[in-house]
Curated annotation (Swiss-Prot):
Keywords: Peptide transport, Periplasm, Protein transport, Signal, Transport. PANTHER family: PERIPLASMIC BINDING COMPONENT OF ABC TRANSPORTER. This is Putative ABC transporter peptide-binding protein BAB2_0812. It holds the Pfam family SBP_bac_5. CDD domains: PBP2_NikA_DppA_OppA_like (cd00995). GO terms for molecular function: peptide transmembrane transporter activity. One of its GO terms (biological process) is protein transport. It comes from Brucella abortus (strain 2308). InterPro entries: Peptide/Ni-bd (IPR030678), SBP_5 (IPR039424), SBP_5_dom (IPR000914). It is found in: Periplasm.
Amino acid sequence: MRLRNFYSALALSAAVFAGPLYAAAPAMAAGTISGGFDVGPGGFQGNFNPLAATGGFTWLVTYFEPLVIYDDKLENIVGDLAKSFEISPDQLTYTFKLAHAKWHDGEPFTSKDAKFTFDLARNGKTGSVFAARLASIASVETPDEKTVVIKLKEPSPSMLDTLTKVMMLPEHALASIPPEQLAKNAWWSSTPIGTGPFKFNKYVADQYVELTANPDYRGGRPQVDKLINRYFADPAAAIAALRSGEIQFTYVDSNDVSTFSSDSAFRVIEGDSFVVNYVGFNQEVPLWKDLKVRQAFMHAINRDAIIQSLYGGAAKPANCVYVADRLVPKAIDAYAYDPQKARQLLDEAGWDKINGSKPITILTYYNSPLVANVLAAMQAMLAQVGINIVPRTVDTPTYNSIVYKQGGTADEFPLIFAGLQNGPDPSSINIGLNEKQIPPAGSNIMRIRMPAVTKALDAALAETNPAKRDARYQDVCKATNANLPWGTMWVANRYGVASSKLENFIWTPAPAGGPYQAHPEKWAILE
């Protein structure tokens, strides 16, 4: 099929995927902002436990808070619940001076809460996704109620970046729950308390969460009385709700942007996603053991055509896990579209004996028409060289239950189409590739055990000289390009659309939703 006709057919299929599936709407009171804050890549995680969160921080940070946080441009890490912090010259001691803050039940936030949180986050029994990332912590000390001292076993230049995602938790509310029972405890969706500008009020399962203003917030009472997060099974339904005025914000795909950009009733927000989209090869599945098969996979996909035809040019090809110029050396393989070479590589690998035309499931949590069309394009291209993939789309909780399951069958997900944060700090990619991060320790869900990749990552993580750090991550780029633990596709821009009625509203297309300084206490809506 010619590409032009093929993509015309895909455009038609997008209309089919866009059928409305509406979430029940709560009554809108004056002074209420409602949004689809978890619409988009990753979607709703299925729980409100920040220790287990791999996304959804745009919403979580409205009522939970970390010690430190990125600014809204994702350029600098600044204090949040820590009013100040300093790092010792040997980079082994981090000292945080805490702000005067209260939990939503009126109890004071103290250093004991911070230590309690870090102890939970380092304990794999809690289901924490941070256990491996915080393994370099030797101790957490509390010399007084407003001081926290973290001591490391060895320098960890990525430590501050990790701490931006560790939301502080109340010791007095959670200490009685055994660590192994914490992950799925009802507390997270019924009576959670944080220190943020909004307080948890109620959750109507799979419909919406309602927060109310925290009158005692240290940054001042929020400008609106309520903040509501609506859940949508279909992104098209969120767009319809935005147009009708039921919500004032949602994520949109690049192919929806043009319908809003010329409408003064809305504001389009665009930015770098810092997320590399990739095809993951499950390394416990024999299909992908031969590098030539993985190379053939790359040469079979016309990434440039997909980027131009489906992403509207709003993406950049990724030939390794990074696209930032400073992290990508010139002498790497571009894996140019070459179906003839793909067939040759498959012949050399003996693909007909390995699998031939048998169907191979490619699992994804991306539920948008755009990604459905992307996978359809990949399916057609790969079929031309003799690889038969069959897309399977599930919601994020189901996806996580499959890929993180211990003792599961690798055949459940021989391939995935997913995304993982590769910035603002380049160390963030480590959790998906390093052998030490294989679940339950981390998020190396493809069970990658490639010594060259792990060695390059470890060297980059240990580099404390800023002048040498980029060169170390160039080595990571070289290792992932040569060994293909993933088939890296592209890094795309991301978009949000906000009603022009919103004032002081900050949304940044950050990986995993941030967190970053969004100042939700300053958000307002024109009546």
